[in-house]
């Protein structure tokens, strides 16, 4: 992402190169990947993780031992209220993972830089609307 995609975009388009103007956004496993990239690269100052697979084995202990690479990042987290209501031994942990991730990020960045939105429904409920809300939240200028 940071070695090929961003340099290619910057070479072909007149885009800003600052972290506060560079975002990564994903849904489900893509949400996990977006959050992972935010921990690994200071390039991303806008991060969206919607119904991200934070239950993935080893991710939460790893995240607890790290800080986001961009100290001024703004993060949008979103999860459906029904997502943790399952018998699946992995997926049932998702709500606790999100609550913990929100806590970690708020400690690192401050409450004004972290938005956690709980939506009615499950993993596949109103995905386009949820994505739009996340993008609107991240692209809105931060409150001073």
Task: Describe each PLM feature range.
Residues 1-144:
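Non-catalytic cap/lid and distal C-terminal segments of serine-dependent acyl enzymes
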């Amino acid at each position: 992402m940071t070695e090929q995609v961003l340099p290619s975009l910057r070479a072909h388009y007149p885009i800003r190169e600052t972290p506060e103007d560079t975002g990564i956004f994903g849904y489900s496993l893509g949400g996990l990947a977006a959050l992972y990239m935010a921990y690994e690269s200071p390039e991303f100052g806008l991060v969206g993780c919607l119904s991200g697979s934070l239950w993935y084995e080893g991710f939460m202990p790893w995240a607890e031992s790290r800080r986001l690479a961009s100290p001024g990042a703004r993060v949008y987290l979103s999860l459906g209220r029904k997502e943790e209501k399952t018998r699946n031994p992995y997926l049932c942990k998702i709500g606790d993972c999100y609550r913990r991730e929100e806590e970690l990020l708020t400690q690192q960045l401050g409450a004004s830089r972290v938005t956690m939105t709980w939506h009615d429904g499950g993993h596949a409920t109103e995905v386009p609307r949820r994505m739009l809300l996340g993008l609107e939240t991240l692209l809105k200028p931060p409150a001073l």
